[in-house]
């Protein structure tokens, strides 16, 4: 595998910013499908892929989601062309015969409710990270948020399922509006060690 060039690394990491303001340029459905088709190839434990994505795009759906958000997140949701709800499906073990066929009975690994919840949350979080990087790779800006009513979102958008919300993220073409100076990050010595 070859190292990405500096321009690609800048776009994915060092120059990318969390956006709070959005242009009114729409995101075509084909781009949303392309985005998912990249995300689905990111690795998860035993190929569990428990994340489920709801692309909130219509004015009516955005208003419903904004009403369940905290503080300044509502206006961001209303302004962005799309906000995705990244959820996790607690019924994910039922897909493992298809997704992990080299281990028949793999769904039994997640028979314990705690193991199922932990596995679903952990691996959907991985997929959420892949989502952010895939969106940036396609030229989209991203504004992830965790300030919202999880139970309310679950009732409003996942009723009748065993899916729970993890986090939300607005996507689109960002503006400089509300863009804060880049905050510091921890240095290697503060966050990592080699043993």
From Swiss-Prot:
Record-listed E.C. numbers: 1.-.-.-
Family named by the database record: Belongs to the nitroreductase family. HadB/RutE subfamily.
A Pfam family annotated for this UniProt entry: Nitroreductase
Top-level division of the source organism's lineage: Bacteria
Cofactor: FMN
Cited PANTHER family: MALONIC SEMIALDEHYDE REDUCTASE RUTE-RELATED (PTHR43543:SF1)
Protein name: Putative NADH dehydrogenase/NAD(P)H nitroreductase Caul_0018
Flavoprotein as UniProt keyword: yes
SUPFAM superfamilies noted in UniProt: FMN-dependent nitroreductase-like
Keywords from the named record: Flavoprotein, FMN, NAD, NADP, Oxidoreductase
Naturally occurring in which organism (per UniProt): Caulobacter sp. (strain K31)
GO molecular function, one term: oxidoreductase activity
Entry keyword annotation includes NAD: yes
């Amino acid at each position: 595998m070859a190292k990405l060039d500096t321009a690609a690394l800048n776009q994915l990491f060092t120059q990318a910013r969390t956006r709070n303001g959005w242009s009114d340029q729409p995101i075509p459905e084909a781009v949303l499908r392309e985005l998912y088709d990249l995300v689905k190839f990111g690795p998860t434990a035993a190929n569990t892929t428990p994340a489920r994505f709801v692309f909130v795009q219509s004015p009516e759906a955005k208003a419903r989601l904004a009403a369940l958000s905290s503080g300044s997140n509502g206006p961001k949701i209303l302004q962005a062309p799309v906000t995705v709800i990244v959820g996790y499906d607690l019924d994910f073990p039922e897909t493992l015969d298809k997704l992990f066929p080299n281990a028949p009975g793999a769904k039994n690994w997640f028979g314990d409710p705690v193991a199922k919840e932990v596995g679903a949350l952990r691996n959907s979080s991985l997929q959420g990270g892949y989502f952010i990087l895939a969106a940036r790779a396609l030229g989209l800006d991203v504004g992830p948020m965790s300030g919202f009513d999880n139970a309310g979102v679950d009732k409003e958008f996942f009723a009748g399922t065993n899916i729970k919300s993890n986090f939300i993220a607005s996507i689109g073409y960002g503006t400089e509006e509300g863009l804060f100076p880049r905050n510091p990050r921890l240095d290697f010595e503060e966050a990592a060690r080699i043993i």
